[in-house]
């Protein structure tokens, strides 16, 4: 216990409290169930999901699009854990065929439970603010790598209940806010059922199809959104894209712009494919173009590219 003088008021604070108004960093526990909706304003996409998390059991499950895609991260399977993804797939002979894919962990990269909530290490209390009629604490974290500067905010009430998570990206070279996404949470509960982590029986799981570089995003889509790093797995896929399509940009500024367009394209492709539609999208030669550039190519009409790249 320690004392804090705030104006003329003497506050008695718990030993584990932060110095700002005696507020403790929210702790959502080692076991929870939560629903959410991921919003990608650039693509005008809203993607619902439902998550179950059990840290002590070394397992998690996240369903996307009302269960159309189910991901199980089981850390105790095999030597280093396994991710199982059950998802509809379009092939040359099948439409929305339900398949199971498997990604095994390694000694260097063991599988761990995937949280649907951000790790609040490094976050600081910013202010109190109403969100949809509820007075929330706002916790903030700013991270920067190179020209990428991301500001993360979480709106939360007590006992620790998440309401909204927001990322706003600023590129210092472009001097612009070029990225944003939000997650709105609901139905948070500090408990879950144990059998929810067992994948459906009777299915044979196979390796994820090519390209190999996209396996992590296919197996664990939410990891890039709740991770508070300006350089995500999606950013690391820009290198293979440039190599495949022989990209050479005239300046560092153009490189930053094209990488930003690519990230938005990649998110749009994978989020749309999780919807279980009768067609699939894919990364192609236009994935580092802006919406305006693609619109000019199509005569001013923005049309989703439904032909998956197979090169």
Residue ranges: model-predicted function:
Residues 24, 29, 83, 96-173, ...:
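Extended beta-strand-rich segments in extracellular/periplasmic secretory proteins, especially
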Residues 35-41, 65-67, 140-144, 168-169:
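Generic short beta-strand segments
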Residues 66, 87-92, 97, 143-151, ...:
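Long non-globular sequence segments
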